[in-house]
Amino acid sequence: MAHKKGVGSSRNGRDSEAKRLGVKAFGGELVSGGSIIVRQRGTKFHAGENTGLGKDHTIYAKVDGRVKFEVKGAFGRQYVSIIPA
């Protein structure tokens, strides 16, 4: 008979680090050029006027101004624009 209890090891117990995705500047908010507006996976939001789209689909402001979210087109796409202030 075993004099020690057999102790199994769990193969679970790990998780990936949160990626901090989401909207960083909301509608009507003043932002400066170069600031991040949305961090996302894929294009849930599309880049509108005065905004750029990074290679990881991050939308950023190209000019200083106010953030504007709008739904356009037949497919109901969400666009993020900057209205220069």
From Swiss-Prot:
Molecular function terms from GO: structural constituent of ribosome
Gene3D superfamilies on file: 2.40.50.100
SUPFAM superfamilies: Ribosomal L27 protein-like
Alphabetic keyword roster: Ribonucleoprotein, Ribosomal protein
Gene Ontology CC entries for this record: cytosolic large ribosomal subunit
InterPro entries from the UniProt entry: Ribosomal_bL27, Ribosomal_bL27_CS
GO BP term (any one): translation
UniProt KW Ribosomal protein keyword: yes
Pfam families from the UniProt entry: Ribosomal_L27
Similarity annotation: Belongs to the bacterial ribosomal protein bL27 family.
HAMAP family, per the entry: Ribosomal_bL27
Name of this chain's protein: Large ribosomal subunit protein bL27
Organism for this UniProt entry: Cellvibrio japonicus (strain Ueda107) (Pseudomonas fluorescens subsp. cellulosa)
Gene this chain is encoded by: rpmA
